């Protein structure tokens, strides 16, 4: 819950898996959904289910808890599916399995990918060359290579299925089934002001984690910042 990107994506994921919505069509937060997710996070903090050091440590340090056996559940980068099978990185190999993301009742109907992506900058002077790079980088062969060298999980479901079936990705659990319910929480695509919006989100969440704001105040702070961004 440090003031960096992971708390923002955590809030998005919670709201989206709980209620199927984060932003309304006009780009503003869906207050009911986002506030419910914030209150859930606040409950975890108040009931001391968040390790004190995770309020100020990096997201990667928090993620690595799953590989050290000090966490029982992780929502984070899919690369940890492969990391959890690497004895050099994980002390509990064989004890971790991907499951379908839970919803408020039973399984969630949808989940989301992280908002990072690769594309061609509108200011690029070599758009065709850049497009070819994107096509190469996201090709099936390159996705296999990136899994081998970087533990990156393929975004192509066909490649993911192939690596699971040939045993490259082991202990895959519900990963393939999960991949089929991934969708974007952004009704109009990722906004141009995403970085500023995310900053407002994670700073408000961090203040809540440190006891400086309650859930309602955290929501008001981030919603106010988003309103300013929309009106610029």
What is the predicted function of each stretch?
Residues 53-67:
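Short helix-initiation/N-cap motifs at beta->coil->alpha
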Residues 26-55, 97, 101:
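Glycine-centered hinge/linker elements that transmit conformational signals in sensory
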Residues 215-226:
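Short, well-structured alpha-helical segments that form the helix of a local strand-helix-strand
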Residues 72-77:
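Paired acidic/hydrophobic, glycine-rich loop segments that form the ligand-binding mouth/hinge
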Residues 1-30, 71:
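Extracytoplasmic/periplasmic solute-binding protein
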Residues 47, 87-152, 203:
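Extracytoplasmic/periplasmic substrate-recognition and gating elements
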Residues 98-100, 148-200, 207:
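Long, aromatic- and glycine/proline-rich binding clefts that accommodate carbohydrate-like moieties
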Residues 18-19, 44-49, 70, 84-88, ...:
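Sec/Tat-exported extracytoplasmic proteins
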